[in-house]
Every structure is written in structure tokens, then in C-alpha cells.
């Protein structure tokens, strides 16, 4: 197996099953996790990029669990493992909406996983960010809440 399609060290802590079941699922999966997307990247843009590597079966955009707005990740499922491997080789680390995107193996989409797992509804990584990132909603959400003036106590 080529280095570009090997499993990374990341493991979904919410996976339902044993570590060996998760490893097996990842090694057989046709589903990819795509991260570091702009909040403004569309499903159509994802489809255009990933369909260069094969027939895309399904795209599930990651959503803020409260606002139901995009929050910077998605799942892309192919019909075959070889198509997904091509995407791992050729799409991981490329630019989309002026951002370097990350592509990693996923054990398979399960309903509910499309929602951010952070306290504020988005991704955890966006809650504590201290730098300003226009493509991902500005400053980190928890930092923004501390900075925002409290208008309730007037």
C-alpha cells in the first residue's frame, strides 16, 4: 500500500465497536473525511473536485448542530475503495477555496456524525482558535463569546 493511502493515527473516539473493528472498517472503507474546509465551500465544489478521482456516491456536509450551517468538514463516499484511494493520493493537501484541505479515511458515515461536536455546535478545533480565520467564522467561538459585549445587562 502506498504511503498516501495508509491509515493515519487519528481515530474517531465515538466509533461504536472495538479498536480492531475500527481498523478493519477503515481498511475496507470507501468513505473519506475531508477537513479544513471553508464554511463557504459548497457541496457542488466538493463534488467537482472529488469526482475527478471516481464516481462519488454520497457527500454529507458537516453542519453546526445548532444553526445547521456548514462548519468546515464533510464526508465523501465513493462506490469503490480504489476510487477513494485515488482521492487520498491526489486530493489530500490540495487547495479548495484557498485552503489546504485534509483528507483521511473514515469508517463510514452514520446519521448524526454530520454535526459538529463542539460545545457551541461547530467543530472543537474552531472553539479554541485564537487566530482570525475569515473562512472559518473569524475568531474561535469561545474566544468570540468572551470578547462580545454582554447586551443582556442594559
Swiss-Prot record:
Q: Which GO terms describe its molecular function?
A: RNA cap binding
Record has Calcium as a keyword: no
Q: Which GO terms describe its cellular component?
A: nuclear cap binding complex; nucleus; presynaptic cytosol
Compartmental location: Nucleus
Domain RRM per the UniProt entry, residue ranges: 30-108
InterPro entries attached to this UniProt entry: NCBP2, NCBP2_RRM, Nucleotide-bd_a/b_plait_sf, RBD_domain_sf, RRM_dom
Binding residue positions for mRNA: 10, 33, 102-106, 113-117, 123-124
What the entry lists under Pfam families is as follows: RRM_1
Gene Ontology biological-process entries: mRNA cis splicing, via spliceosome; negative regulation of viral genome replication; primary miRNA processing; regulatory ncRNA-mediated post-transcriptional gene silencing; siRNA processing
* Alphabetized UniProt keyword annotations: mRNA processing, mRNA splicing, Nucleus, RNA-binding, RNA-mediated gene silencing
| Highest rank taxon of the organism | Eukaryota
Q: Does the keyword Nucleus apply?
A: yes
State the oligomer form and interacting partners.
Component of the nuclear cap-binding complex (CBC), a heterodimer composed of Cbp80 and Cbp20 that interacts with m7GpppG-capped RNA. Interacts with Ars2.
- Quote the function comment for this protein: Component of the cap-binding complex (CBC), which binds co-transcriptionally to the 5' cap of pre-mRNAs and is involved in various processes such as pre-mRNA splicing and RNA-mediated gene silencing (RNAi). The CBC complex is involved in miRNA-mediated RNA interference via its interaction with Ars2 and is required for primary microRNAs (miRNAs) processing. Also involved in innate immunity via the short interfering RNAs (siRNAs) processing machinery by restricting the viral RNA production.
Per the record, the similarity remark reads: Belongs to the RRM NCBP2 family.
Query: What's the protein name?
Result: Nuclear cap-binding protein subunit 2
Q: Which organism is it from?
A: Drosophila willistoni
Amino acid at each position: 500500500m502506498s504511503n498516501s493511502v495508509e491509515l493515519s493515527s487519528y481515530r474517531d473516539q465515538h466509533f461504536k465497536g472495538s479498536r480492531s473493528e475500527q481498523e478493519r472498517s477503515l481498511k475496507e472503507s470507501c468513505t473519506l473525511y475531508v477537513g479544513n474546509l471553508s464554511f463557504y465551500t459548497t457541496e457542488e465544489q466538493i463534488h467537482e473536485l472529488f469526482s475527478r478521482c471516481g464516481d462519488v456516491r454520497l457527500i454529507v456536509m458537516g453542519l453546526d448542530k445548532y444553526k445547521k450551517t456548514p462548519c468546515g468538514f464533510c464526508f465523501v463516499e465513493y462506490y469503490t475503495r480504489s476510487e477513494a484511494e485515488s482521492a487520498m493520493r491526489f486530493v489530500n493537501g490540495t487547495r479548495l477555496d484557498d485552503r489546504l484541505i485534509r483528507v483521511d479515511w473514515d469508517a463510514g458515515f452514520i446519521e448524526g456524525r454530520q454535526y459538529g461536536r463542539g460545545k457551541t455546535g461547530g467543530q472543537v478545533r474552531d472553539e479554541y482558535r485564537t487566530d482570525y480565520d475569515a473562512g472559518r467564522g473569524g475568531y474561535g467561538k469561545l474566544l468570540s463569546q468572551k470578547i462580545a459585549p454582554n447586551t443582556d445587562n442594559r
